[in-house]
Amino acid sequence: MILKNKLTKETLDIPYSEFRIKFAKEIQDAFESYRKTQLNKYSWNFKDDNSLEFNFYFELQWNFNHFGNSNWYIEKI
């Protein structure tokens, strides 16, 4: 994975497993924001709650970059 810092333009090239460890708090914050957004949608009442986490990780790059409040963003997976 290639991550880039929005402020310093520093680039990290790390494996997914290291990303999960190093950015655990940012991932959790992004997931909670994603979860709240999805559950507030009227149409979500007709869907399965168990698919929330799957859907979040399926589009991890977009969700982390848009729902997370981090100085880092995923440039490429």
Language-model features and meaning:
Residues 7-9, 51:
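Glycine-centered tight beta-turn/hairpin loop motif at sheet-sheet or coil-to-beta transitions
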